[in-house]
Each structure stands twice: as structure tokens, then as C-alpha cells.
Amino acid sequence: MPTIQQLIRSKRQLVKSRTKSPALQGCPQRRGVCTRVYTTTPKKPNSALRKVARVKLTSGFEITAYIPGIGHNLQEHSVVLVRGGRVKDLPGVRYHIVRGTLDTVGVKDRKQGRSKYGVKKPK
């Protein structure tokens, strides 16, 4: 506990809240170019091959982003849109690739929850 004299000398420091997606730099999304597209395995209780991509953003950051949905068309040099949002069972993956924009196509044969996977309304 500081004395009154110590508080006069220097006021209390504000606690700054850390952002969960620093590479976006306060923007809702960022554009980037895929440098590597590969699969990784999740943390302990789960088992799968999760599709991820290394992306070089326009902000200069190189990040790992998750590719949601079943099947994708991404490869090296694909231009993608990246949003925030981590994947709980993949350590270090704090971003999602937005489906249905730029070089990323929407998920094929998707009927429900279409807006999250960039799919137009079926006729």
C-alpha cells in the first residue's frame, strides 16, 4: 500500500488490457497471402487432422490461421481474408480464414449455418 506522499510523487499506473488478436491491429479483418497450407493434430483429448495455413498479412505479421468447414481450395499464394477467433484445441492458432471471400470458396453442399461458411442460398 503506497503512502500519500508516494502517490503524489507518481500516480497509479493504468492496467492495459492485452488484445487477443494483435496481428489485426484493431481492424475487424485483414487480407493476407498463404505461405503454407498444412494439417496439424489437436491437443490431448481430441484427435483429428485440422486444416491450417501460414498467412503473411498486410500488417506485416506472419500468423497461423484455421480453415473452417469441410474441404477447401487454398494453396500457396492464395489471397485470403483473416478474422480473429481462436481454435481451442490448436495451440497458437488465434485467427480464422473467412470462407467465400477473395480466393477462398464457400463450403460445398452446405445447407445450414451458411453465412459462416460463405455459401449462397440454394435455389
UniProtKB/Swiss-Prot annotation:
Gene3D superfamilies: Nucleic acid-binding proteins (2.40.50.140)
One GO CC annotation: chloroplast
Keyword Chloroplast: yes
Keyword 4Fe-4S recorded: no
CDD domains: Ribosomal_S12
Any GO MF annotation of the entry: structural constituent of ribosome
Database matches in PROSITE patterns: RIBOSOMAL_S12
InterPro entries: NA-bd_OB-fold (IPR012340), Ribosomal_uS12 (IPR006032), Ribosomal_uS12_bac (IPR005679)
Keywords, comma-separated and alphabetical: Chloroplast, Plastid, Ribonucleoprotein, Ribosomal protein, RNA-binding, rRNA-binding
Subcellular location: Plastid, Chloroplast
GO BP annotations, alphabetical order: translation
Pfam hit, one: Ribosom_S12_S23
Record note on quaternary structure: Part of the 30S ribosomal subunit.
Function (record text): With S4 and S5 plays an important role in translational accuracy. Located at the interface of the 30S and 50S subunits.
Protein name in the entry: Small ribosomal subunit protein uS12c
Protein's organism: Anthoceros angustus (Hornwort)
Record gene name: rps12
